[in-house]
Structures are given as C-alpha cells and as structure tokens.
Amino acid sequence: MRPSHTYDRTLVPFDGGWTAVERMRQGKEIVVHGDGTSLWTLTHHADFAKGFVPLLGHPRTIGDAFHITSDDAPTWNQIAEALAFAAGVEARIVHVPSDAIAAADPDWGAGLLGDKAHSMVFDNSKLRSVVPEFTATIPFEQGAREIVDWHDEDPTRKRVDPRIDALMDQLVETYRVG
C-alpha cells in the first residue's frame, strides 16, 4: 500500500507541528517553501481506511502495489490558508526557497528537497479497479478544522518547537518582501 501523506487530527502537516498554527495565531508570518504553489496530496486517515480495508485479503492485491490517496491536491499556500482559517486567523506567508531552508536546517530541507518541494498528485485508478466504490470525501479544509479543534481541546497538545520557531523568525526576516 502506498498512502503518501496520510494524516489525522494530531498531525499538522508543517515541520514543527503546531508551531506554524501558533505563529499564525500570534500574528506572525510562517514559512512556506518555494512559491507555495506545488501541489501536495493530503489524505485523511478515514479516507485511507476506506481504500485499505477492502484490499485486505483480496486475491487481486497479492504482490501488487496500490496508491491510496485523496484526489484533492491543494497547494502549500492553500494548506497554510486552510489551517489559518480553521484557527480563526489569516495566514501571513513568507515564501522561502527550498534550498535556503535546506541550508539553514538540513533535517527540514531533506523533507522538502526529496519530496514536498515537488508536486505530488497520484492516480487511484488501479485502486478503483479493485475497490470501485472508493472515494475520498474528507477535504483538507475539514481535516484542518479537526486538527485545530483537537489541539484546542487540550492546551498541552499545543507544543511549539522553539528551534523551528526561531528558525522561522530568521528565515522570515531574511526573505520577507516589502
């Protein structure tokens, strides 16, 4: 099974986790790699399960690989905006070249240069040939609300990564336009 980026209410899809949402709530800018327009497929865990469970033990799946992803592929700008909207604020985005992020933080950069900086859109036709009723129905906007609501339910879940927070301050200062 090839799920790509599957998430649940506990997973903020930005390095530093809750840090990006907390920054937005504080009126601070957040870093989005590149120009923010690369497409990224985020799949809600419940949608993944709808594709995965019917494949279990199915004779046509033995020894074969299947993508199980959403058909929705928002841009990274849209992902940030959905989280901001769910948090009741506006996203203030500063675009930073992926290479610059990688130079400043090799761990963050590895996930960008090897993956997230490139558009990722998947074809689920093979999955649908075995599970024709598969449809991902949970858009990231709904998932973003679940993420924010879950974190808001218990303040101990709102963990800010001080290293990523400071790095974002540094990158924002360097790459802010205007």
Where are these regions (language model features)?
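Conserved beta-loop-beta element that borders a ligand/cofactor-binding pocket
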Residues: M1-T10
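Substrate-positioning beta->alpha
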Residues: F14-A20, H33-L56, G63-D64
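A short C-terminal helix-loop "cap" of Rossmann-like NAD(P)-dependent dehydrogenase/epimerase domains
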Residues: A20-H33, V89-R92, S125
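Glycine/small-residue-rich pyrophosphate-binding loop that anchors the diphosphate of NDP-sugar donors
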Residues: L39, K116-S119
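Residue-level signal for the nucleotide or nucleotide-sugar donor/cofactor binding architecture
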Residues: T43, D71-P74, F122, T135-I138
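Mid/C-terminal beta-alpha module of Rossmann-like enzyme folds, strongest
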Residues: P54-L113, N124, S129-V130, E146, ...
